[in-house]
Amino acid sequence: MGLKAKLQGSKENAVNSMIYKSYYDDEIDDNLVYLESRDGLDFTGNIFRIVEELSTGKYGDLKIYVHAKPQAEDKIRAYQKNYNLKIDKIITKEATATRILEKAKYIFTDAGIRPKYVKREGQIFVNTWHGTPLKLMGKDNVAEEHRLGNAQHPLLSSDYLLYPNQYMKSTMLEAFMIDRIFPGKILYEGYPRNSVFLKPSWLKEKLGLEDKEIFVYMPTFRGVLMDRDDSVQRDDVENYLSQLDSRLNDGQMLYAKLHVLNASRIDFDKFEHIEAFPEGYETYDVLNMADVLITDYSSVFFDFANSRRKIILFNYDEENYCSYRGFYIPLEELPFPKVQNVDELVSELNSAKGYDDEEFIKTYCQYDNPDAVENILKTVINGENASLVKTIGNGKKNVLIYAGSLTDDMINRLNEVVDVDEYNVVLTFKQWDEHICNNHEEIFKKLPQGIEIIQFRFNLTPTLSESNNSKSLLERSFQKQFPNIEFERIIDLTDKKDEISQILNNYIVKK
């Protein structure tokens, strides 16, 4: 659909008008805080701990708004009751969430953000991400390298990227190809969710489990995000839990929790010594009861290592898993015992911790501390120097190049014009381009070395007023696609003059 046709699509334009009214007309509300966890599918971890700290009232009379999909709303309300959280509004409607986003002063997320959100000057956006990476991601995960844009939008929109260790900072910025061009600040501080492991567990006593040896099993997500099969993991886990249940004694209890992306139900009623995580309590409060953590390829072990308690890797499907998902850290370099069957697992559960993890903790729990969330909010909201904050960048100007479908001829032209010695060269293309989606592995290998990629993720979404003012639409579309980034030059190598060309050429004229 061309630009003219989109400008005439009045029904959707009316919806966009409602969404972007805040962007164009409303002042930013200095007391409004917007938060979302896992794209609204969950409410746990860093985002939960930030809400918990904000609820103390130490940071002024703030209005706390949380976006959640309908299936997560009951969980949030249970947390409100058990933790006395001050949440002023739970937003379940997408359009409403985006409107509130556009006028919120403070924004916190641990993953993505509403796709129609456009960053505004004066907003403060903090991205905590959802864990130190073990598994390859971004450009390093070949199966999904052509979908970089899904993570780039919230990362580039951020004023602060939170990293609990130097390894995570370097790995993430390079994997998502923003290490040379991210214009915001790096917040070196502990993860809010990890502070619980540096304090005694209060939940074990509350649940009457003082005389129990507690095990927690938290397996990772399996599969490619766009091609999920929850039932496969559910069947595997259920089989192993059945075997394990018969081997545990009455003084032992195991709590099992599937990854949020594998939320298939398991019938726990048939087990004697195994239960699902108790509802109404934050995940890491439950995990902090554990004497032993059982996991596999999940980043949870980076966090739990703070407790200095035993970790077992139950990697029964290592060969198969590694066939489609690689690791930054070889499993054999991790200090934790690794088991492939229930017999080996039971043996380790009944054995004391027998490995040295001090170097691991020093590297991957580098900035974790009991006061992390307080330090973050003092820095972000109060403007205090409570955390280590750094900027990155190489001092070079940024150049943006649009090269269409990245045919061989276009790649040859790219190699002729790219100068990575003088500029940070950013390549953009349509994330949904069929030729690129079908041939991305071959194409990416041919691209010039040293360039960054920001995939063009969004179609035009005009409002009613923009139907008569395409310039405003093009300016907003550019800001949504390339938040916070300034370009010295923009080069359009195509002759199609499609939507992307119009957006980029409008930016050139504006400058």
Segments predicted by a language model, with ranges:
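A donor-sugar binding/catalytic signature common to diverse glycosyltransferases
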Residues: 105-136, 281-324
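Conserved catalytic-core segment of nucleotide-activated headgroup transferases in glycan assembly
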Residues: 44-51, 56, 191-267, 406-417
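A nucleotide-sugar donor-handling region in carbohydrate enzymes
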Residues: 2-17, 132-138, 150-227, 261, ...
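N-terminal pre-catalytic "stem/leader" segment of glycosyltransferase-like enzymes
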Residues: 1-98, 392-486
